[in-house]
Amino acid sequence: MAIKVEVFSTNSCPHCPAAIDAAQKAKDKLGDAIDVEILKIDESKDNYQRAIDYQIMAVPTIVIDGDVVFVGAPTDFELIEKLESML
C-alpha cells in the first residue's frame, strides 16, 4: 500500500512552492510507493476542513499517513529520506 503524502498550502504562501516541489521530486524518485496530494486550503472548504481536522496552524505542512511530519518546507533530501525510512 502506498504511503499517503498530503501537502497543505495556500496560494499566497511564499514557502509552499518549495514544499510542493519537494513532494513532486519525492514522487518522481519513489514512484508508486507514495501517493501525493496537494491541498490548497484557500481553494476548497473540504481542504480547509481537513487542515482543521489535522490541527494545522501554518502552511506549508506535510502530513504523511495521517501524521503531521513537517511544518515548513523540507528539503527534497529530508522528505525523501523520511519517506524511504517508512518503506
Regions picked out by a protein language model, each given a short descriptive name:
Residues 1-29:
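Local sequence-structure signature of Cys/Sec-based thiol-disulfide redox active-site neighborhoods
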Residues 11, 40-43, 68:
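Structured beta->alpha junctions
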Residues 14-15, 45-46, 78:
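Short alpha-helical
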Residues 15-18, 61, 75:
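Hydrophobic residues in alpha-helical membrane-spanning segments
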Residues 32-46:
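Thiol-based oxidoreductase modules, predominantly thioredoxin-like and allied folds used
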Residues 52-63:
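Structural micro-motif
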Residues 64-87:
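Non-catalytic, surface beta->alpha helical segment in thiol-disulfide oxidoreductase systems
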